Design a protein with these regions (language model features):
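Non-catalytic, low-structured ubiquitin/UBL-interacting segments
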Residues: 1-7
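Surface-exposed patches in mature extracellular/periplasmic domains of secreted proteins
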Residues: 36-46
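Predominantly the structural core of cysteine protease catalytic domains
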Residues: 7-34, 52-177, 185-221
Length: 221
């Protein structure tokens, strides 16, 4: 499978059965903002490249680490390309993250929006909780500056704006904004074939925003 910039820019992430939306949403965000970084940090082993696996650079415990991924590691439960249903570069990155956590999918089933961004980019990400979420203008500025942005929904049940379209305890990529409506656009790692909406629009300046979105992570440009 391709791991160069062109190959990384194309596929659409489909989360699969693992609970690592915090990481996949960050991958999607960096895919949009800096696909070259993703391409640089994955190396195919063997001839042809990838025939003997890959090495992925991730920022783990405060330092860059090369994590090995064997082709046999790419199981049936993980993320795939939503178009083909086959493993993609994101599957390799996902397995690298799991291998960096002792190879146990159960160990990576929950984390914060900022954690995924930091692990992939190696840069500190700002994290905002219900007390002080970004405004529409702040989200817009972050997107315009090319920063990766993800948000997490209420862990029990979103009851604010767009509540019926949001999955509880789930992390979404903030993929864009609509200046005419004052809404940000969230993209769901579950993929376009999911029973849940793939894109959700929500007004971050709505008084009830914090009852739907409880945390935001914003990375460096």
């Amino acid at each position: 499978m391709g791991t160069d910039r062109a190959a990384i820019e194309r596929p659409t992430v489909d989360q699969g059965a693992l609970g690592d939306c915090w990481y996949l949403a960050a991958l999607m965000s960096v895919q949009r903002t800096d696909p070259e970084l993703l391409a640089e940090n994955i190396s195919g082993l063997g001839d042809p490249p990838g025939s003997e696996g890959w090495e992925v650079r991730l920022y783990v415990d405060g330092e860059w680490t090369d994590v090995a991924v064997d082709p046999s590691d790419l199981g049936a439960q993980g993320t795939v390309d939503a178009s083909s249903g086959e493993p993609s570069w994101a599957s390799i990155y996902e397995m690298a993250m799991i291998n960096a956590h002792d190879g146990r999918p159960s160990a990576v089933s929950a984390d914060t929006p900022a954690a995924g961004i930091e692990m992939i980019t190696g840069e500190r990400a700002s994290e905002y909780d219900t007390v002080a979420q970004p405004s529409f203008e702040e989200y817009k500025q972050a997107i315009d500056e090319g920063r990766p942005v993800t948000v997490m929904t209420d862990p029990l049940k979103p009851i604010g704006p767009a509540a019926d379209d949001l999955v509880a305890a789930h992390v979404y990529e903030v993929s864009g904004y609509d200046e005419a409506t004052g809404e940000i656009i969230l993209t769901n790692p579950h993929g376009p074939q999911s029973q849940n909406p793939y894109e959700v629009r929500i007004d971050p300046d709505h008084p009830g925003y914090a009852f739907s979105i409880t945390m935001t992570g914003i990375g460096e440009p």
